[in-house]
């Protein structure tokens, strides 16, 4: 691959990176967070985004970012190497339990039934967090705007007698990268208790990546201290981006001292340096 510095007019070399103002961390109480943002967003196509994800970036709509927090390295980008993945007994049970769900993959699009499920999910799982009051426009900006190769996956029960669509159970947004699938966001029926739909969704993505010949499923950030993120450590082996390198993680022994230099200012794709 030609180094991007040899292509001064390439989209990668044209990207700029800046740090946001501090804001309250949404994962750890009492922490202050910052993000490093890649701009301009219209230059970030699927190839560029693949390289950014390898460097620990994620996206929210067309906003591409990674943690850039002073004195904190709690957010660890993680991915599952699908060729080595070994499901646990519990995960095998979840796969068997939900394998009758019908998955339909389509381009990103608005659907009133999806939005209604999203609002029920937010009200039940994240009440008071702000997202439970998202308007349709906010929902679309968050999940349905993308400049890369993105897909919407809906999971339903089998069609009812008479041909009526089965009950909608879960909706997931994924990005298709050059080296894997990236899990963007998933929401599901909150009234179905103890279903582990989220676990099943990741297992489904792992199987899809295998079928497409892609080596990884990127799961976003894992935070050891956050109960919401604990499930990601249940997928083995799990690789994390530590000090600019992807390494196999032992979630029980990972050493993450409160030093921001290595992660927050890790090298950027194409040899860029982070900005303060």
From Swiss-Prot:
Keyword Transferase: yes
Cell compartments where the protein resides: Cytoplasm
EC class: transferase
GO cellular component term of the entry, any: cytoplasm
GO MF entries: arginyl-tRNA--protein transferase activity; leucyl-tRNA--protein transferase activity
Short name of one Pfam family: ATE_N
GO biological process, one term: ubiquitin-dependent protein catabolic process via the N-end rule pathway
Catalytic activity field: N-terminal L-glutamyl-[protein] + L-leucyl-tRNA(Leu) = N-terminal L-leucyl-L-glutamyl-[protein] + tRNA(Leu) + H(+); N-terminal L-aspartyl-[protein] + L-leucyl-tRNA(Leu) = N-terminal L-leucyl-L-aspartyl-[protein] + tRNA(Leu) + H(+)
Annotated transmembrane regions: none
Annotated keywords: Acyltransferase, Cytoplasm, Transferase
Enzyme Commission number, as recorded: 2.3.2.29
InterPro entries, per the entry: Acyl_CoA_acyltransferase (IPR016181), Asp_Glu_LeuTrfase (IPR017138), N-end_Aminoacyl_Trfase (IPR030700), N-end_Aminoacyl_Trfase_C (IPR007472), N-end_Aminoacyl_Trfase_N (IPR007471)
Claim: Cell inner membrane is one of the keywords in the record: no
Function description: Functions in the N-end rule pathway of protein degradation where it conjugates Leu from its aminoacyl-tRNA to the N-termini of proteins containing an N-terminal aspartate or glutamate.
NCBIfam families: PRK01305.1-1, PRK01305.1-3, PRK01305.2-3
Family classification: Belongs to the R-transferase family. Bpt subfamily.
PANTHER family, sorted: ARGININE-TRNA-PROTEIN TRANSFERASE 1, ARGINYL-TRNA--PROTEIN TRANSFERASE 1
Protein name, entry field: Aspartate/glutamate leucyltransferase
